[in-house]
Amino acid sequence: MADLKQFAEQLVNLTVKEVNELATILKDEYGIEPAAAAVVVAAGGGDGAAEEAQTEFTVVLKDAGASKLAVVKLVKELTGLGLKEAKDVVDGAPSNVKEGVSKEEAEGLKKSLEEAGATVELK
């Protein structure tokens, strides 16, 4: 039992590079697709490199603020949603405005929405 706890401790403390190497070994030598490898990193392993390596972001509308109509129009324009769908996104805050976007696009969306009076968070 102590060996398993020690193994678990080592697994949780792997760096992102080490997790990638482990994934390659599991795939190449054992034919195992390590879909859960990212879970180990997300569980707190590594040295914070997981945050630096993030390439896709989600733009989350926390609050529309006082200019709700302007935010609805902007969400409609930025996402290509219809007016009703954009209104539903704004009314349902906190809600995801756009998912899986690059850092640059996410920051641009955040800036635009904040200029319209909304409170926005990037995840």
From Swiss-Prot:
Organism lineage string: Bacteria, Pseudomonadati, Bacteroidota, Flavobacteriia, Flavobacteriales
MF terms (GO), sorted A to Z: mRNA binding; structural constituent of ribosome
Bias (Basic and acidic residues): 100-114
InterPro entries linked: Ribosomal_bL12, Ribosomal_bL12_C, Ribosomal_bL12_C/ClpS-like, Ribosomal_bL12_oligo, Ribosomal_bL12_oligo_N_sf
PANTHER family the record matches: 39S RIBOSOMAL PROTEIN L12, LARGE RIBOSOMAL SUBUNIT PROTEIN BL12M
Name used for this protein in its record: Large ribosomal subunit protein bL12
Alphabetical keyword list: Ribonucleoprotein, Ribosomal protein
Name of the coding gene: rplL
Domain of life: Bacteria
Region (Disordered): 96-123
Alphabetical list of Pfam families matching this protein: Ribosomal_L12 (PF00542), Ribosomal_L12_N (PF16320)
